[in-house]
């Protein structure tokens, strides 16, 4: 088991905090993120990037007078009228022709290059609209989460939707603050990227005690939040998911 210092997480801290430095937002073209959540995520971010058709979603929910900082992708989904309106209001549009990468990966790479230029290694990027539509899109979002975590282990990437949130926990010890006004009761630890040799938890209804997680063996789905602080120690990267009810 890794012995790194404990990493502290608060997936919905942005609901009660103003925009902070190195807090980026990527917007996807998904109905799983409604206007109230998108607006709160937007307000808490110092940089907003729409992934191709995410520009349509942002435009239709928030209007043309609130442009993102950038639109990134192959631009086969973003409407021409949306791009024109955004460019008129100062948004940078970046066409990236790479059929081996999806638009979320392109947007995350764009955010990462911006951090690199500023010497930032521990930023936070939140992805709005990662759930609720096509299952292959959800898996692509999780794949992007794993790739991002492997490339930038000190940074954090959180997937957000109106009904769920998820983030990758790297090998080591973690403490997660539970915001009971919006999170739970259900949660899970999912070994998406491969077997997790050992996981130990505190603060859940059914805690794990050094058990192995793997598809076809044990998956900690439909667990329940028990305490206001959840402690997790994992030997390998594992996906943390939590139910969300924004009211």
Where do the PLM segments sit?
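Long, charged alpha-helical interface segments
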Residues: 162, 168-247
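Short glycine/serine/threonine-rich phosphate/pyrophosphate-binding segments
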Residues: 34-36, 57, 101-107, 134-139
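N-terminal beta-strand-loop-alpha-helix module at the start
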Residues: 2-85, 89
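Short phosphate-binding loop-to-helix
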Residues: 90-119
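Anionic-ligand-binding alpha/beta catalytic cores of soluble enzymes and soluble regulatory domains
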Residues: 122-178
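Long, charge-dense
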Residues: 74, 80-87, 97, 101, ...
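Solvent-exposed alpha-helices and their adjacent loops that cap or buttress functional pockets
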Residues: 14-21, 39-43, 63-64, 85-87, ...
């Amino acid at each position: 088991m890794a012995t790194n210092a404990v990493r502290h997480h608060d997936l919905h801290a942005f609901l009660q905090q103003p925009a902070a430095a190195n807090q980026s937002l990527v917007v996807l073209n998904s109905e799983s993120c409604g206007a109230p959540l998108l607006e709160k995520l937007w307000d808490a971010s110092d940089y907003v990037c729409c992934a191709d058709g995410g520009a349509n979603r942002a435009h239709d929910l928030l209007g043309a007078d609130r442009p993102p900082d950038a639109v990134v992708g192959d631009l086969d989904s973003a409407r021409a009228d949306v791009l024109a309106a955004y460019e008129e209001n100062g948004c940078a549009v970046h066409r990236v022709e790479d059929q081996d990468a999806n638009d979320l990966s392109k947007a995350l790479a764009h955010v990462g290059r911006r951090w690199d230029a500023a010497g930032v290694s521990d930023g936070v990027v939140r992805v709005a609209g990662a759930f609720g539509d096509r299952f292959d899109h959800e898996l692509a979002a999780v794949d992007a989460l794993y790739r991002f975590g492997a490339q930038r282990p000190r940074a954090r990437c959180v997937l957000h939707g109106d009904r769920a949130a998820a983030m990758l926990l790297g090998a080591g010890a973690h403490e997660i603050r539970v915001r009971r006004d919006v999170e739970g009761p259900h949660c899970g630890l999912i070994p998406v990227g491969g077997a997790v040799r050992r996981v130990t938890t505190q603060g859940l209804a059914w805690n794990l005690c050094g058990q192995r997680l793997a598809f076809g063996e044990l998956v900690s789905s439909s667990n329940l939040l028990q305490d206001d602080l959840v402690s997790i120690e994992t030997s390998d990267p594992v996906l943390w998911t939590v139910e969300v009810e924004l009211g």
